[in-house]
Amino acid sequence: SPALSARVTRTVNTLAVLPTSSWFRPLSADASKMDGLNVHFAAVDEVHEHTGPEIIQKLNTATGARRQPLIFEITTAGHDRHSVCRQHHEFSVKALEGALPHETADPWFAFIATIDEGDDWTDPAVWAKANPSLGVTVKIDDLKRQIDEAREMPAQQNAIRRLRLNEWTE
């Protein structure tokens, strides 16, 4: 927008608001290069691909000087049940079920879009549970084709169930 463009300076990898010394840019995937950050907002994508908890730990501790920091994580399900992604998934389920004290759960917002345990993953009636934008950004015909292929090629099933239906797999 013109109003936003007037306030934000753009470079190749950074958006900056110079009067407030604020910036938004991609960070290294190497946690050892993340010391000294002062984070107000961080978006962490594809948490299931993180090989360890170090990046998220660094971002969490880098919010200490902020009154209302926000760390936003988005991911599909993974396959490593010992990963930081799985730990955050299990914490999220507990928060959503009310199984955590409110002072622990209240700062944690979770939205999990997945098919239910016991659902037939090949049934088109359940696909929208894991794909809230089904028919908009996720094309029904594409999803149907991929699921039909996975039904016939069992080696594809874990990937489709994990990446398209958000089920944890082995």
What is the meaning of each model-derived region?
Residues S1-H40:
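Inter-Walker segment of RecA-like/P-loop motor cores
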Residues W23, M34, A42, I55-K58, ...:
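Residues in flexible loops and secondary-structure boundaries
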Residues S32-K33, H50, D80:
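Glycine-rich nucleotide phosphate-binding loop and flanking beta-alpha elements
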Residues F41-A43, F72:
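Structural motif
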Residues D45-E49:
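Walker B catalytic acidic pair
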Residues P53-E170:
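Non-catalytic, compositionally simple segments
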